[in-house]
């Protein structure tokens, strides 16, 4: 019997070999990540008049009521902005009775403001696959900021397999951090500053820029087509504008605009844990943070020659009204689960983990951002296609990069 927890890479491979996860033509081994499986879109996209959940019916039965047409994805097809599509995935499931699954967009998908969620037969919730599920998987896709082109076989989201109840409570998280530090300061911190824990680990936004003239990106309202299969092909300025705080040090988020920002803290996920960016807390502001939620074991474990941890890039959208952000404001939360076993290969270990050393990295489709240069003496650093490792700059870390932050639970917040 599988130990309780998130299933690691070797256990996912076993699910595939036993036929619990299957696809015509097999499943590429490269799609199996340390704690998740990349799912591939199929050959047809159905254009919908609205989103839906099947409830007491199969997806294909209810699809007939909402379908407005079909697109052939075998040669590539264009998906329009703000139009929902439903795409059958190549992978199907026949899960053992003790295993359930949960889906999230891939990092590269979320950074393009492409909203995705998995739908199952008889499903009452998006992105949740019940224990012992047998059947097809479908992906709802809604491009928000850009018109995109996709082709069958492309991967837009991931599936994480879980047994038992592996969620770490606050005490467990504090203890895990004591054994192997999880969060580190990404910039100068005040003496005694702590990272806060309350049903997960809070992360705050970095509006310092750490030596650059801007602190993030805002998606442009562009009619240009973005082919997701192309790499390092598009100019940043055609799709993004750089944003910076106002004279008071605040960044004003405009309603329904999409922003890429970065966490002030650096995060390192131990090999025995998996993390997920939790849904936004509406009491913290009308914000949606982080479409792409999975952080695999080994994320931020950049090696002995670098400062530990990696910044989390935050995908943020304000709703209804403008919203003011300040440097260091808590913006999102990481929740943690135990692994059923450590993965045989960790994130960043030859698996094409593009964002392991990121500061503020755009998707792989974009060229290096030559408008985002950081100059230190005669040394010129770029970020974009090759994310910067600014943690190594002495004036960015103030010599404190190696010291983990102390964690404090909500009990000590006086709330």
Question: What is the predicted role of each segment?
Answer:
Residues 1-415:
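DUTPase catalytic domain/fold
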């Amino acid at each position: 019997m599988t130990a309780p927890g998130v299933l690691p890479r070797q256990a996912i491979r076993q699910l595939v070999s036993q036929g619990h996860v299957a696809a015509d033509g097999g499943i590429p081994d490269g799609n199996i990540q340390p704690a998740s499986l990349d799912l591939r879109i199929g050959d047809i996209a159905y254009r919908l008049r609205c989103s839906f959940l099947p409830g007491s019916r199969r997806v294909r039965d209810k699809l007939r009521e909402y379908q407005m047409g079909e697109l052939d994805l075998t040669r590539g097809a264009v998906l329009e902005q703000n139009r929902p599509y439903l795409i059958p995935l190549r992978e199907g499931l026949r899960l053992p009775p003790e295993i359930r699954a949960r889906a999230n967009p891939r990092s590269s998908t979320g950074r393009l403001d492409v909203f995705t969620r998995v739908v199952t037969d008889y499903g009452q919730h998006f992105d949740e696959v019940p224990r012992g599920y047998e059947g097809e998987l479908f992906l709802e896709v809604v491009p928000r900021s850009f018109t995109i082109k996709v082709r069958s076989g492309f991967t837009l989201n991931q599936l994480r397999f879980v047994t038992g109840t592996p969620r770490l409570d606050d005490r467990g998280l504090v203890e895990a951090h004591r054994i192997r530090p999880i969060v580190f300061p990404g910039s100068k911190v005040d003496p005694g500053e702590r990272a806060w824990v309350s049903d997960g680990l809070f992360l705050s936004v970095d509006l310092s820029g750490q030596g650059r003239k801007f602190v993030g990106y805002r998606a442009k309202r562009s009619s240009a087509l973005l082919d997701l299969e192309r790499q390092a092909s598009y100019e940043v300025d055609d799709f993004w504008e750089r944003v910076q705080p106002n004279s008071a040090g605040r960044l004003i988020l405009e309603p329904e605009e999409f922003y890429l920002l970065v966490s002030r803290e650096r995060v390192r996920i131990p090999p025995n844990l998996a993390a997920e960016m939790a849904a936004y807390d509406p009491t913290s502001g009308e914000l949606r943070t982080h479409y792409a939620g999975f952080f695999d074991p080994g994320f931020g474990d950049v090696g002995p020659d670098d400062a530990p941890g990696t910044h989390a890039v935050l995908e943020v959208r304000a709703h209804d009204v403008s919203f003011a952000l300040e440097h260091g404001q808590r913006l999102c939360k990481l929740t943690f689960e135990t692994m059923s076993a450590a993965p045989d290969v960790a994130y960043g270990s030859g698996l094409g983990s593009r964002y392991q050393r990121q500061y503020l990295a755009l998707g792989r489709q974009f060229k290096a951002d030559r408008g985002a240069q950081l100059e230190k003496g005669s040394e010129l650093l770029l970020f974009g296609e090759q994310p910067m490792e600014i943690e190594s700059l002495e004036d960015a870390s103030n010599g404190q990069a190696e010291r983990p932050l102390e964690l404090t639970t909500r009990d000590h917040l006086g709330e």
